[in-house]
Structures are given as structure tokens and as C-alpha cells.
Amino acid sequence: VLESALLGLLQRHAALRSRFSEGGEKQIYEAPPTGLKLRLEDWSGLEESEAAERLAAACAEEQRTPFDLVHGPLVRLWLAVLTPVKHALVITAHHLVCDGWSFGMLIAELSTLYNARLAGGEAKLPPAMSFRDYAHELQKMQGSSEQQSAEVYWIEQFKDGAPALELPTD
């Protein structure tokens, strides 16, 4: 059920299947929505505290693992079985294909897809906006009063400078 819901998410959002060229004419392309690789770590035979420690260590390692922008995938998925009734789904995505705001939306959609499949039905979700449509909307917004208001807001937010961020690099 989980793999089916995750595959449904990848099918809905082409950006999650994106790859980037090394300098050819085409800068970005989409891989077909096939071949979901959900890694499974079964730590249910361990003490719960040790399983939690392994999860923390594995998540830290996951954060340090770079993405291959050319060959992908730019989204990695794995499931840790901590106890027979407690699991952790770990989703790591490159910021080029999923930012913090869209990640929240994806989790909500995944929940809807999972629950629908669990009930034996189809999820009722609005059509997903393609990256191309999103870029078109941004282009239409250029110069609008809404865009100008947003620009004024962010200039005010960072009038004293933006804080330095420590981000892992690829």
C-alpha cells in the first residue's frame, strides 16, 4: 500500500523525477514514473532505544549523502521498521525538486493517497500543477501589484541582511 501511494505521488509530480544535464542543450528532463526503490531497514528485533539510535545515525548519514543531479534520483525513500507497530518513513529530496513548502504539500498528498489505497479506493486530489505551468504563473506574476507587495515585504524582512546558512553541498 505504501509503495503504491509513493508511486502515485511520483506519477503526479514530474518534478520529483527530474534530472539535470551536464551542459547539453536540454537543462532539465523528467524520468518516467517507474521503478520505485523503497529501501527497507528492519530493526524490529532490536531494543527500541537501539533502533531509535540506528534511525538517528542513518538519517544523519542520509543528510550527508550527495545527490547525483545527472542520473538521479533526486528523491530518496526508505522505511525503517522500529517495532512491529512503529515505522519511520524517511524522504530525502534535493532542494531543486522540493522545497519546505512543497514538502508539506507532498506529505499531505501522500497521506491522502495512502489512506485511499488502504480503503481500496482512489484518492480524490485536485490536478497537480506541472513545473511548466508553475513557471508560467510566475512569469505572469512578474510586475504585478502582488509581486511588488511581496518584494517590499521580503526587502523589509532582510533589511539587516540575511542570516548565513550552513547547508550540505552536492
Model-derived features: where do they sit?
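Acyl-group handoff/entry surfaces in thioester-processing enzymes
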Residues: V1-P32, L46-M141, Q147-S149, E156-D170
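Short, charged/polar, Gly/Pro-enriched secondary-structure boundary elements
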Residues: A31-R39
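Helicase-core coupling region on the C-terminal RecA-like lobe
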Residues: W43
